[in-house]
UniProtKB/Swiss-Prot annotation:
The lineage of its organism: Bacteria, Pseudomonadati, Pseudomonadota, Alphaproteobacteria, Hyphomicrobiales. Pathway: Purine metabolism; IMP biosynthesis via de novo pathway; N(1)-(5-phospho-D-ribosyl)glycinamide from 5-phospho-alpha-D-ribose 1-diphosphate: step 2/2. Keywords: ATP-binding, Ligase, Magnesium, Manganese, Metal-binding, Nucleotide-binding, Purine biosynthesis. It comes from Mesorhizobium japonicum (strain LMG 29417 / CECT 9101 / MAFF 303099). GO terms for molecular function: ATP binding; metal ion binding; phosphoribosylamine-glycine ligase activity. Residues 214-233 are annotated as: Disordered. This is Phosphoribosylamine--glycine ligase. One of its GO terms (biological process) is purine nucleobase biosynthetic process.
Amino acid sequence: MNVLLLGSGGREHALAWKIAASPLLTKLYAAPGNPGIGAEAELVKLDITDHAAVTAFCQEKKIDLVVVGPEGPLVAGIADDLRAENIRVFGPSKAAARLEGSKGFTKDLCARYNIPTAAYGRFNDLASAKAYVDQTGAPIVIKADGLAAGKGVTVAMTSDEARAALDACFEGSFGAAGAEVVVEEFMTGEEASFFCLCDGTTALPFGTAQDHKRVGDGDVGPNTGGMGAYSPAPVMTPEMIERTMREIIEPTMRGMAELGAPFAGILFAGLMITDKGPKLIEYNTRFGDPECQVLMMRLKDDLLVLLNAAVDGQLAHTSIRWRDEAALTVVMAARGYPGTPEKGSVIRGVEQAAGEGVQIFHAGTAINGGALVANGGRVLNVTASGATVGEAQKRAYAALDRIDWPDGFCRRDIGWQAVARERAS
């Protein structure tokens, strides 16, 4: 099979690594990719926002499957444009990608199908939103409706903070994404990420993870796209997975089909596990980053076989096998992240750091004058497996400490909740 992978992050490097291991693969292309992905695939200078150019490339190279990594192209309808030319693609249609592209759409779907989630209001004017905040009180959560690269959510502990977040949305801090907002109740519990592989009709559980959103040790500082993750998530017991499928995933699949937008691709549910059970925080319509990296470390099966089954509507006849071990990834970021990251600093020792049970996935990297340099905010993902989360953590940090990059930083406590649980038991 000839496969084209779209994207350039650590998530896409993990997907490329796993796809490259498949006996089904003839040739893997990636656009635009990064130096790490370049070790697994031929990099192509394609503008992935130019759907006609992507389509033409697929026709020229006889691409059998396109795998879409990031959310932007999906929400923009790249899967529809490729399917219109009879090109097989793993990823939801534009209509189905609204589950990520519009938080308000998803909240309304939850209300219609009795899917447990936080109480909410949808607003497209500042005065009404502020009135709702004043009436409800804090703590309260403010979300830009559209795509904001994981940075459009404010957990406001005071009404003043909530009002400032609303001002930011309506003043254009998130562009068109903030033209409408969702204001919702503050939920308490433990967060978890739950993934399903979907073919429009069937949804199969595809692993659990927990990530660390805040930039600093001890979960302090501003939110990021994610500073690390581990899998599996201890809070997602077999009973909790069964409830999540029954109460959240299956009604969503049914609802989307009834709306004429059956969901096929990866459905990523951000959950709050409360004392009353699982509640939906939000949906993403692609693999998480950095959650994908730990899932790929644990996946025993051939990823390409599973993606084909999803594209061909064959998941009812498919099962998924996992390695009986944990995985943990630590994000190395450039100084200045999540604000304006410093680019161009040289990174040494990456090859020497990888080893048995350790993979280093590239995100914001580039080659400059033969040297590996930082070229983004989140730059490397040091990913390790182990019998326990604690063992994976030890391996990951030992590898990370072999990387020579004075201008990079990371959190030193990724996996702390799970490790504390393991020690207590």
